[in-house]
Design a protein with these regions (language model features):
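Active-site-proximal segments of metal-dependent phosphoesterases and phosphodiesterases across multiple
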Residues: 160-180, 203-212
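N-terminal, active-site-proximal structural segment of metallo-dependent hydrolase catalytic domains
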Residues: 4-12, 16, 20, 26-96, ...
Length: 297
């Protein structure tokens, strides 16, 4: 600090104020030290696009603007459609964002209309897979990308489960969760796992219990005391709050640090980005567990 005061003392009269401000700025910078790098991790978004209903050309610009501002590492999309006069929605967003993408549908390539799920990423892709979930009569899928996040591989999965609210729907979702977990076990290659999508079930529903036995709920982990009235179904379209869109994470490898809703305000009077809200979360890599202490012979 003394050398800074000496420098101030050499300033001429009319430059005194400017020198004082510069000296104080340098002193503040010296006291603060180098800026700390954010802890390593990733951000992810999940969002049900509501396919091309209502005014898709206007909605897509709103969605694109928000995603450009956030620049998440990965984006899971549901209700993605392509058909005559509607370019594949995931492809359009990926191209505008400069992201890679993976689209999966039960409709065969070349069909005039295809409907399914997608993953978008700004990170290098190490592996990609897709899978048609059992039972095949329900037309549900999962997309998978293994991406490199600051040199560490992370598996991200996007899915959309059965929407029925009766006992049959619950049974089908349970079957889909079991198949999803088997697919993850076969493709994750011992890298951390994040699973995002529209699960059509509350996080504590019995349908998802097998999933919750292995993975944590990112939004619920961050907002543990403030969940009663939270909904990811857009309250403009649905009366009762229902949080059915989730980002699950592998709790022994990742930590949920932040989470919030997206697209939960109209972009114009009576106009919304979707009939769902999106979910954004920031995950941090968990520190490696300490090695067990050596025991005396």
């Amino acid at each position: 600090m003394m050398h800074l005061l000496n420098r101030w003392g050499r300033c001429g009269g009319r430059y005194l104020a400017a020198c004082l401000l510069a000296t104080l700025a340098l002193a503040g910078a010296a006291a603060a030290g180098p800026a700390e790098a954010p802890p390593p991790g990733m951000t992810m978004v999940t969002f049900n696009l509501h396919h091309d209903r209502e005014d898709w050309p206007a909605r897509r610009e709103v969605i694109l603007r928000e995603l450009k501002a956030l620049r998440p590492d990965a984006i899971a999309l549901q209700e993605v459609i392509q058909k005559p006069k509607v370019r594949n929605q995931a492809q359009w967003l990926a191209r505008k964002l400069g992201y890679d993408y993976q689209f999966v549908s039960t409709d065969p390539p070349g069909a005039s209309k295809r409907y399914g799920n997608a993953l978008l990423t700004a990170r290098p892709v190490l592996a990609r897979n897709d899978h048609l979930l059992a039972p095949l009569t329900d037309y549900r899928t999962v997309a998978h990308l293994r991406i490199a996040v600051d040199g560490q591989p992370v598996n991200v999965y996007a899915t959309h489960l059965n929407e029925r609210s009766d006992d049959s729907g619950s049974r089908i979702r349970g079957e889909q969760v079991a198949d999803l977990l088997a697919f993850i076990a076969a493709t994750s290659d011992d890298a951390p796992v994040v699973i995002a999508g529209d699960f059509n079930a509350l996080v504590d529903a019995g349908d998802l219990s097998a999933l919750r036995n292995h993975y944590g709920d990112s939004y619920g982990s961050v907002h543990v005391n403030d969940l009663a009235a939270v909904s990811t179904l857009n309250r403009h379209y649905y009366q009762a709050p229902s949080r059915i869109d989730h980002i699950f994470f592998q709790q022994d490898r990742l930590i949920a640090r932040e989470a919030r809703l997206l697209f939960d305000q109209p972009y114009a009077e009576g106009r919304w980005a979707s009939d769902h809200y999106g979910v954004w979360t920031r995950l941090q890599f968990a520190p490696p567990s300490a090695a067990p202490a050596a025991t005396a012979p």
